[in-house]
């Protein structure tokens, strides 16, 4: 059996695969749909398993900075193939003992693996998700896809920067060069117009 993800329905610039599933939100079991967040940016990130080692560092990092994402009209959703019962038990475990503690983001349960499969991150032989991260715009089109192998976590700073960059482009019509951060120079798309940037840099 292949170890690689297959049957992905997730493509840049195309509508993000829709889903509806249970999640743990503020300590309760709640039905969550992607369509609930139309009109907002969505950062959807998958992680392999509850009660592991790299995963809590990522989930806690995103949760602790949820207000920064909220301030730019963005929601963050975490997802794995574990059940909501497993999620809740992990959330209820103190951070100093490897738990998540109080969460400021929904934690989704993809128990039938359909969401992970649709997004192309399912490790079929183990039934767990690779570390996929997807940025979805307010029209629910996919703008960014990153998939890490299991051992390496992701950067909240870089995710926040990417959302800010997509929002800047949509608002101003200019494009963002490598390493762009809010307040730094952008490029006017066009052969002549772009020279303004290149002359300065």
Curated annotation (Swiss-Prot):
EC number: 1.11.1.24
Recorded phenotype for the gene knockout or disruption: Reduced size, egg production and brood size. Survival in response to heat and oxidative stress induced by peroxides is comparable to wild-type. RNAi-mediated knockdown increases lifespan in response to the heavy metal arsenite. RNAi-mediated knockdown increases expression of gcs-1 and further increases gcs-1 expression in response to the heavy metal arsenite. RNAi-mediated knockdown increases the expression of isoform a of skn-1 in intestinal nuclei.
Keywords annotated in UniProt: Antioxidant, Cytoplasm, Disulfide bond, Oxidoreductase, Peroxidase, Redox-active center
Highest taxon above the source species: Eukaryota
Signal peptide limits: none
Molecular-function GO term, any one: thioredoxin peroxidase activity
InterPro entries: AhpC/TSA, Peroxiredoxin, Peroxiredoxin_AhpC-typ, Peroxiredoxin_C, Thioredoxin-like_sf, Thioredoxin_domain
Induction / repression: Up-regulated in response to the drug metformin.
Catalytic function, reaction form: a hydroperoxide + [thioredoxin]-dithiol = an alcohol + [thioredoxin]-disulfide + H2O
GO cellular component, as recorded: cytoplasm; cytosol
GO biological process, one term: regulation of response to oxidative stress
Regulation (activators, inhibitors): Activated following oxidation of the conserved redox-active cysteine residue, which subsequently allows for the oxidation and activation of substrates.
Assigned protein family: Belongs to the peroxiredoxin family. AhpC/Prx1 subfamily.
Subunit structure: Monomer and homodimer; disulfide-linked. Under nonstress conditions, present in the reduced monomeric form. Forms active hyperoxidized monomers and disulfide-linked homodimers upon oxidation by hydrogen peroxide. Forms active oxidized homodimers in response to the drug metformin.
Miscellaneous comment text of the record: The active site is a conserved redox-active cysteine residue, the peroxidatic cysteine (C(P)), which makes the nucleophilic attack on the peroxide substrate. The peroxide oxidizes the C(P)-SH to cysteine sulfenic acid (C(P)-SOH), which then reacts with another cysteine residue, the resolving cysteine (C(R)), to form a disulfide bridge. The disulfide is subsequently reduced by an appropriate electron donor to complete the catalytic cycle. In this typical 2-Cys peroxiredoxin, C(R) is provided by the other dimeric subunit to form an intersubunit disulfide.
Protein name per the record: Peroxiredoxin prdx-2
Organism: Caenorhabditis elegans
């Amino acid at each position: 059996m292949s170890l690689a993800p297959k049957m992905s329905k997730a493509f840049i610039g195309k509508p993000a695969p829709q889903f509806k599933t249970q999640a743990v939100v503020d300590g309760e079991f709640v039905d969550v749909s992607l369509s609930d967040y139309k009109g907002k940016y969505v950062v959807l990130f998958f992680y392999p398993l509850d009660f592991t080692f790299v995963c809590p560092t990522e989930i806690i990092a995103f949760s602790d900075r949820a207000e920064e994402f909220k301030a730019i009209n963005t929601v963050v959703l975490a997802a794995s193939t574990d059940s909501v019962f497993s999620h809740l038990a992990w959330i209820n475990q103190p951070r100093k003992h490897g738990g998540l503690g109080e969460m400021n983001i929904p934690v989704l349960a993809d128990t039938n693996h359909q969401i992970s499969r649709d997004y192309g991150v399912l490790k079929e032989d183990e039934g767990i998700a690779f570390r996929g991260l997807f940025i979805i715009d307010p029209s629910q089109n996919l703008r960014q896809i990153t998939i890490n192998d299991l051992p390496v976590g992701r950067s909240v700073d870089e995710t926040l920067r990417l959302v800010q960059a997509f929002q800047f482009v949509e608002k101003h019509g200019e494009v963002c060069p490598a390493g762009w951060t809010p307040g730094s120079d952008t490029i006017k798309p066009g052969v002549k117009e772009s020279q303004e940037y290149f002359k300065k840099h």
